[in-house]
Each structure stands twice: as structure tokens, then as C-alpha cells.
């Protein structure tokens, strides 16, 4: 990753901190218009105790008609306006065509459900930097990690360890430990990369590589996050992958916080496998179907086995052979079977080449439709263009956070300062005891961010729908919240009436 600096550091406070400055940034950015492709809840919507939108007008207080400031796309992305239309088309097809919706391409409809998983490959591959054959939309994140590890974690008497990041999201930790237990290995086979000191908020490349090197001779798999969920650190996927492969170690990536957030080049970086969810920056909907990547060298199906090392390391274990077919071992299901023989019911598994051969069951057409709606929004631009906007948007947020009126801010940004080492998210650690009071004020003013007990706010302006004016307005509200928390921290209720507790999911 190249070193870059925040382009807003050189601006004078009087210019940078004005509403006019923020509005000018929005006016000259062509991607600002993408906000129109999303539903932005109003402040009244957030406090309304009935489901759905609050009706604007005389019954609503004036400030409640204003749009909320939604900086929580790192937890759940906002809904694209086209999602409802797409899902209605799916429902209408099901209602009017029944089972024929599986096989027939109807005018004005969505792709037949039999092929809907193929229909999302092209755009998905652009977002993660892969060949279409290397990606598949299926299952959910942890399920996909288990499916992929069942294929790629092949412990031997010489290599049996899994290396993960010490502060990994708990589900990744559970998955790795349970895979170790599944192979009847001791929990000590799990190696965690811990910060070198308690004062270090994130991991340097040098430290990550040194831990991997230390355990290289006995390590079968490295599983790391593309972006760390708590600190927002963007790991150097290319560098770490190259290091692992040079040491004969299979490497997989959890891209939950990276997909749709930063440009990826999984194919060119020679990543072995990866998995992600589609409900954060991808805006596919809560708990929607996830995605997986398998490099083409691992997805071959044919008469010649993939190149292997003598002990089957480096992600290439001995292959399964079934009547002259050779392919990588995996947990198999009928939807991963070649389409030409999927319905012959002869019990001979012929995997689809590539990532699709890892599918188990037919995917939910409802979920796929929701993901398709999101992908069609991403198709309006490119990941490089979104990244350029995101760097400026988050850089503006950082510059404004560092300009605290009245002296030293009562918080610290624990996300890397180098824009190349982070995505959209900035994690802000408040002084002890401030969190509940600050959240109370933010929620009252229609600001949605994510909390991490005991003291951290994760603030993530999404380039698809957030604006510089959002950031400007947020800073005023946040700084006022901090001032109130410092003066009378104990008087604020823990959470305001009618507003859900700040989102706890990732």
C-alpha cells in the first residue's frame, strides 16, 4: 500500500468548517447523485413506533421531516430504491407463473431462478477483482467460511495450525476453533496475532508477517479480515497473501468490511479463497445471502489433478477422483453439480468448474433479487471512483474531528491515519464514561452510528449515499454531544425513548 495523506489537512479552519465548503464538495462531485438511488430515513422515521415511513406534514414536528445522518453502512447498508421494485417483480413472477419461474425468461422480469446465481457473477467479479467463474453468491458469511475451510484447511502431521487476528470478529474465532476441533486437534493449534503492545491500536505489516513467519513451518492456514471490524484497519491483502504463499501457507480472507468498501484484486493477488456478506456496504438487506471467492487454480475440474506439493500444502491437497474427474475436495451439494447433469439424479457429482462448484442448495431467489438490486446500483459507477470519493469523504470527517473547538478533543481516532490503510470507517474512542451520554444526544438529533462497548463509536460515511454536508452536520451535533457529556455525563438516559439501541451487529 502506498503512503497517502489527508488532502484536507492544509485547509484553514474558517474554510474547512463552513457549511458552504461542504456543499461545494458535494456540488462538484458527480457521484453525489447516487444518493437519490437510496431511501434515506427521516428523523421522524427513526423515532416512529410504527413500522414503515412516518407521514410528513403538519402532524410531524419540523425537524422530524429532515433526513437523518446515517453513518452505519458498516453495519447495515441503506435500502436502494430499486430493491422494492425488483422484489415485487420476483413476487409477481412467483404468483403468476409458479414453478415456471425457475426456467422461463419472461419479458420485463428477472432472470429465471435456475440461472439467477449466474446473473450476478459479472458485477460481483468487478467489485472483488476476480474472474466471473471465481465468484459465487451463496449461503452466509460464517457458513461460507466453514465450507471453504472444509476444503482448504487440510491439516497434516507437519502443518496443522490456523493463524487468525487476535481481535477477529467472534464468529471467525468460533469457526476457526471449531474447524480445529472437527479434526480432533488441540485448541492450541489456533494462533492469534496480538498487538505488540496495549497502546498499539492496530497491527503493522511487519508484525503480521513476523508472526506468520514464526509459525510458518507448522501452519496450514492463515485467515484474516480484509478490514478489521473494530479499528477499521485495511490490511495489505496483496503483501500478506504473497508472504503466505511464499511460505507454502494457504490464505483466506474475511471480506465482510471490505467488499463494496475498497477496491479488491483477489485474482491478481493470488488469494486462495475469500468470503463476505452483502448487507453492509453492499446494501443487499439484513442477513441477506453472502458471497465467496475461489481462485481459478483451485476450481479446476478435469482429468489432470492440480499441481501439488508432496504433503498437499499450499492449498493443493490430493484431489478427489471420480471416474476420471479430478477436483478439489469439498462438502458437496446438488446445486454445485454441473447444470447439464444436475437433474439426472444419477448420484455422480460433477462439480461446476470454479466457485459455483462449492454451492450446496439452490439459493433463495428472494435474496438473490435483493442482491441484484444492489449490484445494479454499483454498476452505475466503479469501485475505483467510489474509493476516490470515499477517501475524500472520510478524510474530511477525520479533518473535522481533529478540529475540536476549545482545545484537546475528548476522544481519539484509533483507525490508521494513512488513508491507504483504512476504508470508509473511522473508529473514535471516547473518554471513559462518555459513551451513553453521547449516544443519547446523537440519537435525539437523528444521527445513526455504531457503538462498541465500552467507549468506541464506529463512524462510516458510505460514498454511495452519504455527503459532505452529512459530515458537516454530524460534526456540529457530535461536538455538542461531547460538550454535554463532559459537563453532565451522568444525567443523560442510557438510550432515548423510541429509538433502538445503537446497532450492535457488524
UniProtKB/Swiss-Prot annotation:
Specify where the region named Disordered lies, as residue ranges. 303-322
Tell me where in this chain the PTM N6-(pyridoxal phosphate)lysine is found. Answer: 280
Biological process, per Gene Ontology: 'de novo' NAD biosynthetic process from L-tryptophan; anthranilate metabolic process; L-kynurenine catabolic process; L-tryptophan catabolic process to kynurenine; quinolinate biosynthetic process
Location in the cell reads: Cytoplasm
What Enzyme Commission number(s) does the record list for this chain?
3.7.1.3
The protein's UniProt keywords, in alphabetical order, are:
Cytoplasm, Hydrolase, Pyridine nucleotide biosynthesis, Pyridoxal phosphate
Q: Where is the composition biased (Low complexity)?
A: 303-319
* Principal location: cytoplasm
User: Can you name one GO molecular function term for this protein?
Assistant: kynureninase activity
Q: Which reaction does it catalyse?
A: L-kynurenine + H2O = anthranilate + L-alanine + H(+); 3-hydroxy-L-kynurenine + H2O = 3-hydroxyanthranilate + L-alanine + H(+)
InterPro entries reported for this sequence: Aminotrans_V_dom, Kynureninase, PyrdxlP-dep_Trfase, PyrdxlP-dep_Trfase_major, PyrdxlP-dep_Trfase_small
What is the required cofactor set for this protein?
pyridoxal 5'-phosphate
* Subunit note: Homodimer.
Q: What is this protein called?
A: Kynureninase 1
